Structures are given as C-alpha cells and as structure tokens.
C-alpha cells in the first residue's frame, strides 16, 4: 500500500517555488535524472560491474564488448570478446549477437557460460572458444530449468510440463486439458520462498514438479496497465474465507517415463512449500503449512512410491509460521541438514538429523540470518549473510542498519564476520565454488559502491575491483536522517527515514509527503547508499518538501 499525502497540492506548488533562490549555485535534478526510465537516469546510478559473478574461483564481468576475468592474486584480463563469441557461433551455424548477452554459469567446475539468443540456448566454453551445446527453443516455452547433472532442460508450454534432451528431443511429462490446471509452474502466489515449479534430483534421474488445480478459485479482475489500452486479465486469487487452489507434487522418472504422485493427503487446501531432494534421490522433503498459516510440518516422502515416510517435526505459532527456505543437507554428511526458522523471533540456523532430531542451534541473537551463501570445499564451514552488527562497532543488537557476511564452523558452532563496517552499511557477497573467496559489493549512506575480492577465511581484502564515485557530486542534496520510533506495543522498534528539504529553515513549516509501503519483506529503510532513498524523494526535497 502506498500513501502519498497532498499530492495535488504538491504538484501545483512546484511551480511556485524558485529553485535557484533555494539552492544558490548548486545544480538541480530533473525528473529524467532521477526516475527509472528517464533519459539521463543512468548517469546518477553508482557505477557497477556488469554481470559480475564467479565461474569456479575465477570472477567474470562484462566491460563493453569484452568479458573480463580475474583471480584473487592475478591481474584482470580479457577472457573473450563478442567477436570471438560470434566466431564460435558461426562454426555451429548460429546467428551472431549484436551485443554481449546475459550469461549464467551452468557448471561450478567448468569454464562454460550459458546464454539464450535467437531461440536457442548455448553453452560456450570460453577457454576453448567453442559452443559445446546448443538447444533449440520455442518462443512459447517458459520456466526453463536446466539440470547440470544430465544436461536436460525442463520447461512449460502453456500449462503443461515438458523436457528437452541435449539432442533436442522433447518428452511430454504432463498432458492436462482441463481449464484451471497448471503443471511445472510456481504455486501458492509465490509465497513461502516459492519461485519455481520444477525440482531436479541431484543426479538428474528424476524431476519433481507442482501440479495446481485452481479451477475452483474465483477470478479476480486484474487489469494490465502496461498495454497501450488497459485490458482485463483475470487471475485466480483465493480470497479469505473462499475456496483455495489444490496443489500436489509429481515425480517424473526419466528412465521409465512414468510419474509417481506424493500422497500428501487431506486437507487438500494446504501449502506445499520448500521442496528438497535427499542426496540419495530416494526421498523428498516438503514443508507443509496449513491454510491458517500457523502450523507447519516438515514431512519426508518416498520419491519411489509417493508414500509418506515420516513427519519430522512441527512448528506452531499463534500468529503465523512462514517457512521460507528448504532443508539444506551438509555436503559431507547426508544424514544431517540445516533448517532456517524464526521460532525464537529471529531467523536463525538449526542443525537437524534425518530422524527429525535437533542437534544444535547454530546461530542466535537479536538479529536475522538473511541468506546462506554456501559451504567451503571441505564442507566444514558455512557462509551466511545477516543483520548481525559488525564486531568493529560499539552498539547493541537491533540498533543498526547493517548487513554483513560471516563464516560458521559447523562442528564448533562458532562464527565470525568476514566483512566489516560501521553502524550502517550493506555487504552483498557471492561465494566462489571452493569457498576460498568472496565478491563483496559494499555500500553505505555515504559510500556509493565498493567492490572487492575478500579472503574466505579471514577479514582481508585481496583486491579492489571498483570504487564508484559519487554520482550526485555538484548537486544540491537534501539531508537524510534515520532513526527509530516505537510501534503501538511501546516496545518494538520501527525504522524511519526523513528527507529534509534542501536549505531547511527550522523556523518554517514545510509541505510534507508521507510514504509508506506496509507489505511483508519490504524494508525500505536500509543502510546502503543514501539509506535507500529514491530519486523522486530527492527531487521533491530539492523543491522544498519534507519526505
């Protein structure tokens, strides 16, 4: 929900304010400078490295028509150019690309990049400069899901699931014809960490997938406002107190071509979330949540028969339970896994065995684990990002707008931070395949962006890749203030952000715009660049408004 107060008054009053009298010689922004899609907006975004990612322990990024590569102790060099890529495409009879495509890394241990172009998916070995795989795609295919273990590609066409082999043979997994039944797509309104509808087994012998029947759900009259003339696009949306969709999980065996359905039972109106395969491919784990969203069961099913094997444990809360992350098995112990839960009020890590017994709590405190980045090569250490305050700062938990990255010793249960900062700052990190190195993209209210390669064992910067300049230099900038107010319970802290008008005179009253987005998982006040202030807020503050 977005609330803007006195919008008409704001727009009308803009013409009455003399910007030059307020800002002296400092330059002013236009809306084109600050609003996404503006003609000059890209000039005012802190510089970045395009498509920065790991391929093994080599980092890659696009610079112009070249892919640059580097290692922790070696200088950056050109890995390949667009011309070389087009030469490789010509060898297999494919059309050239007019610009560098968007690349992904399909294999952890191979110098191969994947990209889509001209209705094909290509796998390109940039060391040998050759196309090693070429998949023929149809423009109507969606939800592509590649399996590195077998080279197969799952996809949906309309509302059915199919599989494309490395030799471009198509297998039909589902053939649903009833209206309102969809297979292989994301379900449950993309809640509870769900972002796709297919799940390859570790060795690629089977594919688990969602089947959703929403024929009983009422159509809600959404409108597509992106079209030249707005048009109706009805969408199945389960309203409170009305019928919801029914979801089941199928397991397709590539060798037999047959599907086994998991016997998830009654009630049918429940949420099947966070699907995970066991390392031996014999079982599937599902976090099952009731429709009231206050009771979750972690259940294991046989992937061979569909039978329920065991209900491992239950989480209940009078307010809500929200499973967001699948179980994560330890790489060197298939009988133990990590579970994320907010059972103590903050999202933390817990170590379990496959009998459902909690072995230990791995993290604790008045801070949140945000993401698990991966393990080291030996599987003895885990890397995670969190809001835990930097050990270099002297402030208590809950007072910071800080995100850092830590290394956790799984045996000892102790962790330490690899990144560092002050009261505010955000470290967005990527872990290399071996866990030896991390890419650290750091920003703070007064730091546009710094990108470094850091050591995965100790807090040490090995190489700085980028130090971005302040894109607002020379412009009149408002003062940005952050702080906390108490919620209605008088205890809970709520972050706020205040953008003061440029040239503020504290003896005067100013028109004020209150901006609130009350949705879940949407923290607008951050410790990053300018505390997450948007361009429109800055534009209005330059014109005499409190935002």
Predicted regions and their residues:
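Bacterial Sec-dependent N-terminal signal peptides
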Residues: 1-27
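Serine-hydrolase catalytic core recognition
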Residues: 34, 218-219, 281, 420, ...
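Generic alpha-helix initiation/capping and coil-helix boundary signal
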Residues: 6-8, 147, 489
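Generic hydrophobic alpha-helical membrane-segment signal
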Residues: 1, 236, 285, 336, ...
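Beta-propeller folds
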Residues: 24-428, 436-437, 445-449, 454, ...
């Amino acid at each position: 929900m977005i609330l803007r107060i006195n919008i008409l008054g704001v727009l009308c009053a803009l013409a009455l304010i003399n910007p030059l009298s307020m800002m002296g010689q400092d330059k002013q922004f236009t809306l084109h400078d600050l609003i996404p899609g503006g003609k000059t907006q890209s000039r005012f975004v802190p510089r970045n490295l395009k498509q920065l990612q790991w391929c093994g322990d080599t980092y890659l990024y696009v610079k112009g028509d070249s892919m640059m590569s580097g290692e922790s102790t070696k200088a950056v060099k050109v890995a390949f150019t667009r011309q070389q890529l087009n030469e490789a495409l010509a060898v297999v009879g494919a059309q050239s690309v007019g610009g560098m495509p968007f690349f992904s890394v399909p294999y952890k241990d191979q110098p191969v990049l994947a990209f889509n172009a001209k209705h094909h998916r290509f796998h390109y070995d940039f060391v040998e400069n050759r196309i090693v795989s070429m998949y023929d795609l149809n423009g109507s295919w969606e939800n592509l899901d590649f399996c590195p273990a077998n080279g197969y590609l799952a996809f949906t066409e309309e509302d059915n699931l199919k599989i494309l082999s490395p030799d471009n043979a198509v297998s039909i997994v589902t053939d649903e014809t009833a209206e309102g039944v969809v297979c292989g797509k994301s379900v449950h309104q993309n809640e509870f960490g769900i972002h796709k509808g297919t799940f390859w087994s570790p060795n690629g012998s089977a594919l688990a997938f969602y089947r959703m029947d929403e024929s009983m759900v009422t159509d809600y009259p959404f409108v597509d406002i992106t079209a030249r003339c707005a048009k109706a696009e009805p969408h199945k949306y389960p309203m409170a107190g009305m019928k919801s969709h029914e979801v089941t999980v199928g397991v397709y065996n590539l060798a037999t071509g047959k599907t086994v359905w998991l016997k998830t039972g009654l009630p049918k109106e429940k949420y099947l979330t966070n699907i995970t395969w066991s390392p031996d491919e014999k079982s599937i784990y599902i976090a099952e949540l009731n429709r009231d969203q206050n009771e979750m069961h972690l259940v294991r099913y046989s992937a061979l028969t569909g039978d329920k094997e065991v209900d491992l444990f239950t989480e209940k809360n009078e307010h809500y339970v929200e499973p967001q992350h699948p179980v994560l098995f330890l790489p060197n112990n298939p009988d133990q896994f990590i579970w994320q839960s907010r059972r103590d009020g903050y999202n933390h890590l817990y170590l379990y065995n496959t009998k459902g017994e909690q072995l230990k709590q791995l993290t604790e405190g008045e801070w949140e684990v945000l993401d698990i980045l991966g393990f080291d090569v030996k599987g003895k250490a885990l890397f995670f990002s969190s809001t835990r305050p930097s050990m270099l700062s002297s402030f208590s938990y809950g007072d910071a707008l800080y995100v850092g990255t830590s290394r956790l010793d799984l045996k000892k249960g102790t962790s330490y931070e690899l990144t560092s900062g002050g009261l505010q700052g955000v470290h967005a990190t990527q872990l290399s395949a071996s866990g030896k190195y991390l890419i650290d993209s750091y920003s703070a209210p007064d730091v546009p962006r710094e990108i470094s390669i850091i050591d995965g064992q100790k807090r040490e910067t090995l190489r700085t890749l980028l130090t971005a300049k302040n894109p607002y230099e020379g412009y009149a900038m408002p003062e940005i203030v952050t702080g906390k107010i108490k919620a209605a319970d008088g205890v809970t802290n709520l972050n706020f952000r205040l953008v003061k008008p440029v040239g503020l005179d504290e003896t005067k009253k100013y028109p004020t715009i209150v901006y609130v987005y009350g949705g879940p998982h949407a923290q607008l006040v951050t410790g990053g660049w300018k505390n997450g202030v948007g361009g429109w807020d800055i534009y209005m503050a330059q014109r005499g408004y409190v935002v």
